[in-house]
């Protein structure tokens, strides 16, 4: 069920806005920073990418940028690039099993168009809480914190007080949810299907990550993920200017 955050949380979010620019700034004392493709602020991740690059020189093996049009109304946040997925292709969720499930659901709910192996996003952007491949797919708290400035910038791009249509953040997995929640001052614990109105025209929705492990154990199914994105579709379309707005791709 939809659970609004406290009035205090919403007021704190709004108080962190630069009202002249209409942008959300310094959420949780994190200054939004545009993504840097040459970022090397996490020594452990830099060393890991260097070592993977030696074994797989054809792989991307670098920080992975957010994918999708800046004017999109939905931001999807995962955990981190997968070894043979985004770390190989350079695009979030592209090239592995979790991405195949995600993109099939996005296509079914109107957020992507698939033609053979080609994928075009429609009205959404995709990123990760950590932009570099972590060892054992487990980023440290410090690495998550260092990457949070980029996530804050993505949230700034998604929503401002000037927007006239609903915007939505979809957090895939507890770690991504925690990183987004910290920036937005959301206190609600992670729960699959949780739907939280952060401020006017901005909603956060939580889902289990569509990882191979979660799918194989039945923690998440295609039907469950489809339900999540149908709710997202209903929300972003249910606003006065949604149907006339450009959704990008």
Which stretches of residues belong to each language-model region?
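Extreme N-terminal basic, low-complexity initiation segments
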Residues: 2-12
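Intrinsic-disorder-associated, low-complexity terminal segments enriched in Asp/Asn/His/Tyr and depleted
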Residues: 16-20
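A polyanion-binding, active-site-adjacent surface
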Residues: 23-190, 194, 198-237
């Amino acid at each position: 069920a939809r659970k609004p955050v406290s009035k205090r949380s919403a007021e704190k979010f709004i108080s962190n806005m630069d009202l002249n620019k209409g942008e959300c700034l310094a959420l949780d004392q994190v200054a939004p920073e545009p993504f840097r493709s040459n970022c090397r602020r996490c020594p452990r991740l830099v060393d890991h990418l260097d070592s993977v690059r030696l074994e797989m020189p054809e792989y991307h093996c670098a920080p992975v940028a957010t994918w999708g049009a800046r004017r999109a109304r939905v931001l999807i946040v995962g955990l981190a690039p997968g070894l043979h997925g985004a770390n190989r292709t350079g695009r979030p969720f592209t090239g592995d099993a979790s991405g195949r499930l995600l993109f099939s659901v996005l296509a079914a709910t109107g957020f992507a168009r698939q033609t053979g192996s080609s994928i075009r996003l429609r009205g959404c952007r995709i990123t990760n809480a950590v932009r570099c491949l972590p060892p054992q797919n487990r980023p440290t708290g410090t690495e998550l914190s260092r990457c949070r400035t980029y996530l804050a910038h993505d949230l700034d791009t998604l929503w401002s007080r000037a927007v006239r249509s609903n915007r939505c953040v979809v957090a895939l997995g507890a770690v991504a949810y925690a990183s987004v929640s910290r920036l937005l001052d959301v206190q609600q614990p992670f729960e699959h299907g949780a739907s939280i109105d952060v401020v006017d025209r901005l909603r956060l929705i939580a889902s289990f990550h569509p990882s191979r492990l979660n799918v194989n154990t039945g923690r998440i199914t295609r039907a469950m993920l489809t339900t999540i994105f149908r709710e997202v579709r209903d929300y972003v379309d249910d606003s006065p200017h949604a149907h006339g707005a450009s959704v990008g791709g």
